[in-house]
C-alpha cells in the first residue's frame, strides 16, 4: 500500500463521519441519548476520541522507538489510566463495555465543543505521525491495519448507529 493513497482514503472516510455529524446539527440533538443505548452523538465522539488517542500515543511511541506492553495486572491498568487519561484498550484484562462506559462518563461534563476539538486534534496527530513514519516502520508495526481499525473502520460502525438513530429522530431530514 502507498502511504499517500492510504492517507487520502483515511481523510475521505473521515469526511463521511464529519458530514453526518454536521447533518445531525444542533448541539441539543448531538447530546440527546439513544444513538447507541444511552449514548448520544457526543458520547460516540468521546468514545472515538479515546480510542484514537490510544492509537496516536502508540504511534508516537513507535516513532520514538519505545515499546508498548499491554497491562497484565489491575495495578498496571490503574497506573496506565492515571498516566494517559484513558484505559489501556490493548489489555487482555479489559472487557468491551467497561472501558467504553468509563470514557463516556469521563467526558460527561466536558462540553461538546471541547470533545469535538480534542477529537479533531487527535485525528490530526494520527495523520501527522503516519506522515513521519517510513514505509519500513509502517510495515513492521502493521500501521495501515491498526490505523484503519482505529479510525475509519471504527467510524463506519458508529456511522450506522447514528444514521439509524437520526432516521427515527428526524425522519424527514435530507439523507
Please identify what each model-predicted range represents.
Residues 28-32, 107-116:
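Short helix-to-loop capping/linker segments positioned immediately adjacent to catalytic or ligand/cofactor-binding
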Residues 1-16:
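Extreme N-terminal tail/first-helix region
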Residues 89-101:
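A structural motif
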Residues 28-88, 120, 124-175:
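Short, contiguous alpha-helical
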Residues 2-5, 85, 99-113, 138-142:
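Acidic/His metal-coordination segments adjacent to aromatic residues that form catalytic metal sites
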Residues 12, 16, 118-121, 125:
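Charged, amphipathic alpha-helical oligomerization/scaffolding segments
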Amino acid at each position: 500500500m502507498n502511504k499517500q493513497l492510504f492517507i487520502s482514503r483515511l481523510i475521505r472516510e473521515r469526511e463521511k463521519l464529519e458530514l453526518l455529524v454536521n447533518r445531525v446539527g444542533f448541539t441539543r440533538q448531538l447530546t440527546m441519548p439513544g444513538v447507541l443505548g444511552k449514548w448520544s452523538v457526543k458520547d460516540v465522539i468521546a468514545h472515538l476520541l479515546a480510542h484514537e488517542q490510544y492509537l496516536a500515543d502508540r504511534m508516537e511511541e513507535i516513532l520514538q522507538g519505545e515499546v508498548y506492553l499491554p497491562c497484565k495486572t489491575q495495578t498496571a491498568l490503574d497506573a496506565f489510566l492515571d498516566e494517559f487519561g484513558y484505559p489501556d484498550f490493548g489489555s487482555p484484562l479489559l472487557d468491551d463495555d467497561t472501558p467504553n462506559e468509563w470514557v463516556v462518563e469521563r467526558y460527561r461534563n466536558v462540553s461538546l465543543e471541547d470533545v469535538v476539538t480534542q477529537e479533531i486534534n487527535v485525528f490530526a496527530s494520527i495523520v501527522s505521525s503516519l506522515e513521519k513514519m517510513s514505509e519500513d516502520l509502517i510495515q513492521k508495526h502493521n500501521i495501515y491495519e491498526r490505523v484503519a481499525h482505529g479510525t475509519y473502520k471504527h467510524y463506519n460502525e458508529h456511522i450506522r448507529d447514528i444514521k439509524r438513530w437520526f432516521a427515527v429522530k428526524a425522519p424527514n431530514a435530507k439523507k
